[in-house]
């Protein structure tokens, strides 16, 4: 893929070009306004002709220049007149003097400036969006927008579907604000202590001079006003469909929500910037889903119970500058605690402190209960220390249990010998494959699958798949090429092996033989075909000649030919029958022809110009 940017300082992305083996197969051109608003995404084929496009419309534009912003950074008014405008909010000092800062209050109309309002699809149908501001406790407005309504229209402008959303418990419209606006969040306090030399009886002595309080005001809050990108979170969202006059029903979504835990203050009683414990990692999980029809009847419900696994809490110390010693004798700060005046003035330390925790772990589904079309089922899960499912218990409406137990690399590595395949997989971080899957009805074992891996030299890959009853290989991977593609596979119950030759640098199968092998070709030709960007006509002719090789009588050979974009161009069956595939300039299948050139399948795509 090739990315092309504008030559301006903004370096805005203008075009994406996609190549396959050096040949351009498609491109995307981005039409923008002022490099800030994407007006259209136009898709072109290999012939440089436009195939289809998406269009985007917005609610006007945000003010140009130095934008006025609210407490959360959203636009709240016309541009400021100067780049030197004071972005801190208005503040009143203890002596009732006011610092004339920027108006940081929320403005719903300006906050929606420049927001996406319409998407036009290649079919010329379109979707429109309506927004509203977030609402926290007691209906207080907060920065940021939430979707209020979505309308879907066809190409003729006829309304096809309408969705609208209600937020909060009992559709109150209110959620939980991450943090209320507090002037202290925009101000940090510290002190300056003057230290100077004065003559004494036995030489110069260090004296404490002026003690100055410094209030530093900031354009943005020192604390985070967002969680997962939002200033307000909602534990319940209800989606309606149809029209307000004739709703088709609704879907209620319920999500996990946990407040962060905060200290009351720092060691010196100041407001902390970081929560003692952040619970954001447990928030936003789907707790429940209920679908009702327009009569209020429940047609589907889902209820999830979660648990913490592998939790670790790491204690940290936040250190803030509280006092700085300056002046001719500022070196005193190295040993200030030995000077009573300075120690008293700094209350024993030049810094302020508080603790907080960083938590690791996962919040996973422990039990899921589902009701669908009158049928109930419950699924319970157990996990290992890597968060992988090791046991899944399904209980149906009749109370019957099916248990699936899984074992992974870490389960076998614990008892494995050094240098064994499990030891190699563990240290290469190959942890995701399930190596053993056992199925029980109640406590009776009814099925078992074992996946055996092998170190093939350059990589580790599957060798055998064994199943209960036979407990012999059901699928055996006998060899791979250098790209990790299987070249010989045998299956239990089938008396013939299947061999493959891969081409186009290991990206596509170019030949398949059943009941025989490609050994007569020799490793030199096979490796040359596999490694080539595109197999030569001469090499493909040698492979095709195997069809008449007496030593391969009874075997069945299928060959595959591809175009420069690696789309299947021709399929030659074991009996020699050829099927051809043709594509449009954007690489989509247009038609399928038999060996006589007759179209047997045709495809058309409904995009309006």
Task: List each model region and its residues.
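Non-catalytic interaction/targeting regions
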Residues: 1-520, 527, 552-580, 584-596
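Surface-exposed loop/turn segments flanking beta-strands in extracellular/periplasmic regions
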Residues: 524-538
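C-terminal tail/sorting-segment detector
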Residues: 592-609
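Generic long, charged, amphipathic alpha-helical segments
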Residues: 536-556
């Amino acid at each position: 893929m090739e990315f092309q940017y504008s030559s301006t300082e903004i370096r805005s992305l203008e075009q994406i070009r996609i190549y396959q083996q050096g040949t351009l197969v498609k491109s995307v051109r981005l039409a923008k306004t002022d490099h800030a608003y994407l007006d259209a995404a136009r898709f072109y084929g290999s012939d440089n002709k436009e195939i289809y496009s998406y269009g985007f419309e917005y609610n006007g534009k945000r003010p140009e220049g130095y934008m006025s912003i609210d407490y959360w950074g959203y636009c709240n008014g016309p541009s400021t007149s100067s780049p030197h405008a004071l972005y801190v909010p208005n503040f009143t000092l203890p002596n009732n003097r006011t610092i004339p800062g920027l108006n940081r209050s929320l403005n719903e109309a300006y906050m929606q400036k420049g927001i996406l309002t319409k998407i036009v699809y290649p079919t010329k149908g379109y979707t429109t969006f309506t927004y509203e501001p977030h609402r926290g406790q007691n209906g207080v407005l907060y920065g940021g927008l939430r979707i209020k309504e979505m309308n879907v229209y066809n190409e003729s402008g006829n309304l096809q579907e309408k969705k609208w959303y209600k937020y909060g418990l009992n559709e109150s419209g209110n959620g939980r604000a991450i943090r209320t606006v507090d002037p202290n969040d925009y101000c940090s306090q510290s002190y300056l202590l003057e230290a100077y030399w004065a003559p004494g009886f036995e030489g110069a002595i260090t004296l404490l001079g002026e003690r100055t309080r410094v209030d530093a005001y900031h354009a943005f809050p020192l604390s985070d006003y967002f969680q997962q990108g939002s200033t307000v979170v909602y534990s319940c969202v209800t989606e309606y469909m149809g029209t307000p006059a004739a709703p088709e029903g609704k879907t209620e979504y319920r999500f996990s929500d946990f407040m962060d835990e905060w200290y009351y203050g720092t060691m010196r009683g100041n407001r902390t910037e970081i929560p003692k414990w952040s619970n954001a990692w447990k928030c936003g999980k789907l707790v429940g889903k209920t679908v009702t029809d327009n009569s209020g009847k429940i047609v589907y419900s889902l209820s999830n119970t979660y648990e913490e696994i592998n939790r670790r809490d790491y204690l940290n110390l936040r250190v803030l500058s509280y006092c700085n010693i300056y002046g001719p004798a500022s070196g005193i700060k190295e040993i200030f605690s030995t000077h009573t005046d300075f120690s008293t003035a700094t209350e024993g330390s030049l810094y302020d402190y508080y603790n907080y925790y960083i938590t690791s772990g996962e919040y996973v589904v422990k039990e899921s209960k589902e009701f669908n079309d009158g049928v109930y089922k419950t699924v319970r899960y157990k996990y290992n220390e890597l968060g992988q499912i090791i046991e899944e218990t399904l209980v149906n409406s009749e109370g019957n249990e099916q248990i699936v137990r899984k074992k992974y690399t870490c389960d076998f590595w614990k008892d494995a010998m050094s240098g064994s395949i499990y030891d190699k997989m563990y240290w290469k971080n190959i942890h995701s494959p399930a190596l053993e899957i056992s199925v029980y009805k109640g406590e009776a074992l009814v099925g078992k699958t074992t996946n055996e891996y092998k170190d093939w030299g350059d990589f580790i890959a599957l060798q055998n798949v064994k199943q209960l009853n036979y407990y012999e290989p059901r699928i055996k991977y006998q060899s791979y090429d250098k790209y990790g593609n299987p070249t010989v596979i045998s299956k239990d119950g089938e008396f013939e092996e299947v061999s493959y030759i891969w081409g186009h640098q290991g990206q596509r199968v170019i030949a398949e033989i059943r009941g025989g092998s490609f050994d007569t070709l020799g490793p030199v030709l096979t490796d040359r075909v596999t490694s080539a960007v595109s197999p030569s006509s001469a090499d493909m002719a040698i492979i095709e000649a195997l069809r008449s090789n007496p030593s391969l009588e009874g075997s069945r050979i299928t060959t595959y030919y591809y175009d420069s974009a690696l789309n299947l161009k021709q399929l030659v069956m074991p009996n020699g029958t050829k099927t051809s595939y043709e594509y449009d300039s954007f690489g989509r299948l247009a038609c399928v022809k038999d060996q006589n050139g007759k179209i047997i399948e045709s495809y058309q795509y409904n995009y309006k110009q």
